């Protein structure tokens, strides 16, 4: 394995890490805001219906008055308008539920607060998906251009390449990995989370808990999903960056890659078993011989270019090929990407 390529991959890993850390700040902020809004919803509910800061389950199951139902339906219209601002597509199921709610003639207090909590949860997941999509788009472009640049500078020759459009990145994101795409993975726990939120709420009513005690239980339930979301984001980032590198290899006529696991100080057994092995680009299979192989996987690939050195001789003067000097990445972007 070339030290040159190991150093390049280490640099790329650092750049990707910066994107991940920035996303995690956003994710933390989103979850904290969701918890804050759920607590506010709960406080309003207790202020309206509690006696001595307690609400019985029987009290919670009482039907809303016509005035309360009318106010709820106005809120539902606001929910629909706000959720339509997000690009996330999996919000549609809840939007359909909201549309149905506008025609209901009987709704209980418990159903009303659960609808409000589900709105907050849906808004959280939609925000999370939009933020992850943005991170993945940046990661894909960064990995793609970095790989093409390093190949061209190393070989001294380049091949015309297609710039990764937003649609191309979205297509890569929507490809199923282990049976699901990244959006499905974000939303798959929504029903379970919602059921757990309702369970904690119902337990609070049955046990005579205060709004503060119930709010703590709701926050704990939501925070349990945060760590899963963080793991998902890092694993999918590894996936999208390796997909981008693979496409970059193909764009420069590189036909083989080497599996590289040693950049990860906590290398798993499955990744160690593939470290240093060479595979054909045309036979790359995610989760099999192309990272990620497991959650939090940090393995990557490097191009096998020994057999491609003849590109320097063969390419000069041919259409679609051009000589590349020892230029900086910034200069390369200006000459070949931003032109």
Each PLM stretch: what is its role?
Residues 1-136, 220-221, 227, 234-339:
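Activation/maturation switch segments at domain boundaries
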Residues 202, 231-234:
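A broad detector of short, well-ordered amphipathic alpha-helices
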């Amino acid at each position: 394995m070339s030290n040159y390529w190991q150093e390049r991959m280490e640099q790329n890993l650092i750049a990707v890490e910066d994107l991940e850390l920035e996303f995690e700040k956003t994710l933390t902020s989103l979850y904290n805001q969701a918890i804050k809004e759920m607590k506010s919803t709960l406080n309003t509910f207790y202020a309206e219906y509690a006696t001595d800061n307690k609400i019985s389950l029987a009290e919670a199951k009482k039907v809303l008055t016509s005035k309360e139902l009318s106010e709820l339906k106005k809120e539902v219209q606001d929910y629909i308008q706000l959720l339509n601002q997000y690009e996330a597509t999996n919000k549609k199921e809840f939007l359909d539920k909201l549309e149905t709610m506008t025609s209901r003639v009987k709704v209980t207090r418990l159903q009303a607060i659960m609808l409000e909590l589900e709105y907050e949860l849906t808004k959280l997941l939609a925000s999370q998906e939009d933020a992850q999509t943005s991170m993945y788009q940046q990661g894909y472009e960064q990995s793609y251009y970095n790989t093409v640049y390093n190949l061209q500078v190393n070989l001294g020759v380049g091949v015309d390449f297609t710039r990764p459009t937003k649609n191309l990145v979205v297509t890569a994101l929507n490809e199923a990995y282990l049976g699901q795409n990244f959006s499905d993975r974000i939303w798959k726990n929504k029903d379970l989370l919602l059921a757990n939120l309702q369970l904690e709420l119902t337990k609070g009513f049955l046990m005579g808990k205060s709004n503060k005690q119930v709010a703590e239980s709701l926050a704990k339930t939501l925070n349990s999903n945060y760590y899963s979301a963080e793991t998902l984001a890092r694993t999918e980032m590894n996936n999208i960056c390796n997909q981008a590198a693979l496409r970059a290899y193909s764009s420069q006529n590189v036909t083989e890659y080497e599996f590289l696991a040693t950049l990860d100080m906590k290398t798993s057994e499955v990744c160690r078993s593939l470290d240093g092995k060479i595979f054909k680009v045309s036979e790359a299979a995610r989760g099999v011989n192309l990272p990620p192989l497991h959650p939090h996987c940090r393995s990557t690939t490097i191009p096998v270019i020994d057999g491609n050195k003849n590109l320097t001789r063969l390419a000069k003067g041919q259409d679609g090929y051009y000589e590349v000097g020892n230029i900086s990445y910034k200069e390369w972007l200006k000459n070949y990407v931003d032109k």
